[in-house]
């Protein structure tokens, strides 16, 4: 089914987007071998149904739990650092050949070439996707819950499972005689689009539904930065602190929408790095790769600090340095686990974070005397302590709004990208309530006694049920275990590429294979050693969060999106939008400088 794309930057209508549906069993996996032509090897191999594939309440069909898990896995794979600054598009080996991960059907830097899969025997070739006269008359229209009516094309290949005479049951199951009874069977959908440069490329269509995108967005935004929000509110005071939180939430929501508009200028753009290249060329992509590296490094360090501080508060006889060293032996093994498993483990991270917030709130209601009580709040301040602390609060209060690095990927992964703005609205409503609520509750409970991590206050305050102390420590221990490996993976991939060991040639000698595997192991261990060493030398959690917020969040979430919009949408931007973007950039540069300076000086 053709679908009209938005207007291009020069105002003309772009070519239509053609969608082609290829039947498959959704509970399938890709073969690693691109060369074979048997159905189970050249496309999709059936596997046993997981318990997650079965409908559970509202979680059924395209929103089944297995689809949520797969969508989360794709979202986690979007966090990557690109070394090839000259590459116009992130996930293309050639000008019109996208690469993807066979397990998640997500774009991947080192994935399988889409053309190889489509060009295997019995598959619609890329050149056929827009040439209906070459497609068999057996093509039919099917209906998908999210895509709507889509052209389902087959090629007249008598030896193919997708031959025109094959029944729908055969196409779905790989053989005759089996009834089409699985409600979770559908199709892989590819689309053929024309970029602003006139090149026609074939891409995988987005797969995530709106609820899945909202879930992935919340998972990106709600992190350990919210644990430092009460301290930020203490530094800024009620008046300025709450005002800054509201402004940061609104501003980052608006810039996320600007990124969405920038993506609409060219349907072949997929990632944040693609926007950087489109706006500033190779230098833009290189800058973004450097920023992403710093962001991942800072996140990994802050997780190690959180681990050490939380256990030290529970077991003060052991130093924070001791627990940081212990964290190395705990977070290093998961780095060797496949992404499919890590993605499921990462769910524990957001569950632990939200669980911690709920526990803290319950503790405040349980305790009747201050400090640590919502019934009898501590004394608080309306205005900042001093100018230095006000500047430090800038980074603390802005760090929790940084999800823009993966927002472009989340939009392009949607079945209906036009719903992305509505998803953002829901995401920011939930995130704003969580973040602002945590800041207010923490500040009321501990007032001017609040520490860099609100959990540390709870662990050091007497009067709560005994199990609370162990529970919070356990939750704070789970978060680094769940998230540190995901922060390390992109940096490890960079080291593997630099050392040319990202792929081990099985045809090489045994010595070379062992050396390559040894380097891969070394890289994974080395990154975690770096996390721990930096955490030991820079042990203050609030300073790390303030630096990430003021230095990186302002750049990635406010300055660059406005700059992208000014460059990529210059022919359609309204005058007031141009002024607003320039004002936002100027104010962000000033606030970022003040915040970074305060974090370094303090």
UniProtKB/Swiss-Prot annotation:
Query: Modified residue Phosphothreonine is at which positions?
Result: 181
* Catalytic activity annotation: L-histidine(out) + Na(+)(out) + H(+)(in) = L-histidine(in) + Na(+)(in) + H(+)(out)
Keywords of this entry: Amino-acid transport, Membrane, Phosphoprotein, Transmembrane, Transmembrane helix, Transport, Vacuole
Pfam annotation, one family: Aa_trans
Give this protein's Gene Ontology molecular function annotations. L-glutamine transmembrane transporter activity; L-histidine transmembrane transporter activity; L-isoleucine transmembrane transporter activity; L-tyrosine transmembrane transporter activity; neutral L-amino acid transmembrane transporter activity
Q: Which GO terms describe its cellular component?
A: fungal-type vacuole; fungal-type vacuole membrane
Q: Which InterPro entries match?
A: AA_transpt_TM
Principal subcellular localization: membrane
Consequences of knocking out this gene: Decreases glutamine, tyrosine, proline, histidine, and arginine import into the vacuole.
As for what it does, the entry says: Amino acid/proton antiporter that moves various amino acids into the vacuole, with a preference for large neutral ones and histidine.
| UniProt cross-references to PANTHER family, sorted A to Z | AMINO ACID TRANSPORTER, TRANSMEMBRANE AMINO ACID TRANSPORTER FAMILY PROTEIN
According to UniProt, the name of this protein is Vacuolar amino acid transporter 1
